[in-house]
Amino acid sequence: GFTWDVFNDKTLKVRGGSGFFTGRIPLVFFTNMPTNSGMIQNLVSITTRYKDGKVINRDPRLELLKGNMIIDVNQMISTLGLPTTITPEEGVLPSGIVGIDPDFKMPQVWKTSLALDYQIPASFPLTVTLEGMFSKDINAVRQFNYNIKSPEDTWQRFNGPDERYIYPENYLEHTNINSANVLTNTSKGWGWTGNITVFAEPAKNVNIMAAYTHTESKEISGMPGSDANSAWTNMPSINGPNNSGLMRSRYVTPNRVIASINWRVHVNKRSTSNFSLFYSGYSSGSYSFMYSNDMNGDGVTNDLIYIPKTKDEIKFTSAEDADAFWKFVNQDPYLKKHKGEYAEAYSASAPWIHRFDFRWSRDFFVKIGKTKNTLQLSLDILNIGNLLNSKWGVTKNMSG
């Protein structure tokens, strides 16, 4: 990174940096593999039962485990006399198999930022900051189901403007299991953030801050699940989760405005009070328009809709249904703007939420010996606007 004081007087600074950042994923996606590997698994419970402090039942196999802890799997199998083979009749085939790409890497992203701080000539301190950051996925994470056949040109498609593939009845590579999900990497994701922030002190002991941030982020998968299978089946798509392509990140907040004002009052030499009001405005979430059934026959019900462009592109059983549908489309900003297109995942935004928080604090200065100490008493009222109107500061999300 770097910081450049352009005029050597701190009125204009340019700063930036670039680097690679590595994180991790929830460990449940690693534990999915040994528990869903399709290999022989044997659960052994060896216990000793006590009653009134006396042993009433002791598993004789405990004697076999005396000494150093056994950490070799084969030695453990041999010591306990566990089976090393199993017949098809004795085994239970899992409905799905989970694996991890042997070349899998932890999530890694390349981030580059550039910012400008400018002190505007004014009768009071006034600073404007412009910031931009671009990120590129080096090793993003996704699930890929290798038991699903890839679409081919010989497959049938929908007739009309919606030309998505129709999966055949034999779309599974192996019919004796439903899925073979593999945790793997992709490098196709990217994102950028732009921010403008204004700091001002228009009067003594009065500080004002206001900022606006816009964010765009595209990804292959946000891993929307608690295990390998749900992280794959919950991905919105047109031609199946394996062929989802880049989509807007489900975790991004496209637009956000924040502001604060703080007034510091000197009560006396031993005490000051602070009054602060904080504002935050943003869309409370994003959602996708999807069919409620499995439109393309891939066994997943998260199919993104096609938004008809004209009335002749879609048929209804009654005129009332048609009127209700087009009334809904034309009142929704996203659907109205994207007629004739497939709906993009997580691109429709929930209503904005405007929230105010209030904070009052009182600082008491106490000198003990030669040391000056501060004792603070504070009161926080979160979402204070909701106390005035029950509809203010309320988050609205999709229920299904």
Q: What residue spans do the PLM features occupy?
A:
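Solvent-exposed loop/turn elements at secondary-structure boundaries
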Residues: T3-V182, P351
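Extracytoplasmic loops and strand-loop junctions of Gram-negative outer membrane beta-barrel proteins
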Residues: L43, P94-I100, H174-L183, I238-G245, ...
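Extracytoplasmic gating/loop element in the C-terminal half of outer-membrane beta-barrel translocons
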Residues: L82-I86, T272-G369, Q376
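C-terminal beta-signal and terminal closure region of outer-membrane beta-barrel proteins
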Residues: A348-S349, N389-G400
